[in-house]
Structures are given as structure tokens and as C-alpha cells.
From Swiss-Prot:
Active site: 165 (proton acceptor)
Binding site for Mg(2+): 162, 166
Required co-factors: Mg(2+); Mn(2+)
Protein's recorded name: Nudix hydrolase 2
Span(s) of short sequence motif Nudix box: 147-168
Taxonomic source organism: Arabidopsis thaliana (Mouse-ear cress)
EC category name: hydrolase
Keyword Magnesium included in the entry's annotation: yes
Annotated Nudix hydrolase domain residues: 110-242
Misc: Overexpression of NUTD2 confers enhanced tolerance to oxidative stress.
Any one GO cellular component localisation term in the record: cytosol
Amino acid sequence: MSASSSSTNPMSREDATTLLPSVQDKYGGVMTEMTHPMDPSLFSTLLRSSLSTWTLQGKKGVWIKLPKQLIGLAETAVKEGFWFHHAEKDYLMLVYWIPKEDDTLPANASHRVGIGAFVINHNKEVLVVQEKTGRFQGQGIWKFPTGVVNEGEDIHDGSVREVKEETGVDTEFDQILAFRQTHKAFFGKSDLFFVCMLKPLSLEINAQESEIEAAQWMPWEEYINQPFVQNYELLRYMTDICSAKTNGDYEGFTPLRVSAPDQQGNLYYNTRDLHSRN
């Protein structure tokens, strides 16, 4: 595959006038990041020359990053065989595969990550909301606070943030209790939904006006007896798991900060069962 850049692509002084500027990536490919305006015909000439040179050099994937102000060059790249890989608010990434065999390029992001927050207080009341928008609006359904984890945000931090935004309640993350995977959920992408247990640090509710119709602390038994919960298989399993956790019969996954040579992340694991073996 071909992605992040590491070193400058060597070229002669003559090459520099006929090739697009590029850097080599870690996977035998090259990355070109366009930063200055260029006439499409000149861009086409340089791109063809570059592809010929990179082919002779045995390169594989070719990435072209176009900022939005240079989006007019995208048509030229597509005519040369490039295709869209992904886009962000300020750039478009295109890619081309030189070898004859099937490409091994990494796919665009395949999943969206969401959370559902199980927050229960000392009175065995669960924090629930009714939504102003979305699939459940206007149906009188009480549900856990839910939301999407932001780019670069840890799952546990996202769950705390979503609860605060939707209800005004401060919480402390406890554990991930379960997760669900579905496909073709959002613009054809798959979805990972993590059920998180959080401990309330405050009880006063201040519902988010833009998204939340109502919020309250609801007795747990009243919540699980809603027809919507009883008739929805996923929610029945979720409530069984949450009940088992509350009763001490179930252990979820706790985050452990871990590091690798070039990045940091979190390992979520069952601390109780692991420690019981030692």
C-alpha cells in the first residue's frame, strides 16, 4: 500500500523541470502535494512525464493531494487514470496504481465510530433523552445519550463529551460494556457503536436545545419496560448487559494507555479477569 511520506524522491536537475515535485512513501510509492496554481495543460504534461519516470523507477501507488483552490486540476488527473480516494473540507486526494497486478492501496476510512452512554445514579435512575432530530424524533422514545466520536478523539473522552453536550451532566468514564458493528449505515460506510458506562459526577440536567427535546433521570425498570426497548433485540441485549454490570455479574473493558514506536493509543481490556489469573 502507499500512504504517508518519508523522503524526497531523487531526481536530476533536468528531471526537476519536467516532473512534479514528490516525496517517496514507505510502501514504494510517491506523494505529490500541489500547492501553487498551474495551467491544466502544463499539469497534464508534467503528470504524464512523472508517471513515465515513476514507472521506470518501479514505483507503485501515486498520490496527488489537491487543495480546494486547485480543484480544477482534478479533471486532468482523472483523465490520466487517477481516481478519488477521499476528500476533507480543504483538500481532495487522488490516487493511481502503476503495476499491472491488483492494487494494494489502503481503502478510504471504512467505519464511523459512535457511542451510547449508560449513566446510572445511586437511586438506580438512568440518564435518558428524547431527540429533536433523527430517526426517533417525535416518537416519545427515551434512549441513552448517543453520538459520534470525533477524529482524533478517544472513545472514552467522546462518551463523556456527548453526555455533557446533550444533558449538561458531568460524568466519569468507567468501562466499555459491549460494541456492535453494522454495515452500510452512513453513506455506505460501516458503523461501530460502543456501549459505555459512565459514573455521574453531577445530577442537574441542562438539555441541549438544538438536538434534545427532553432529558431526565428515569427509574431503570421504567426504562427497560418501554415497548421500544422490549421490541428491539439490540436494546434487550444492551439492557441485560447493563443490568448484569450494575449487579456485579459482568465486567467490561477499561482503557489502558499504550504506546508504539510512532503513535499512542488505548488498549481496552477486562482488568478483573486478567488480574484474577495473576
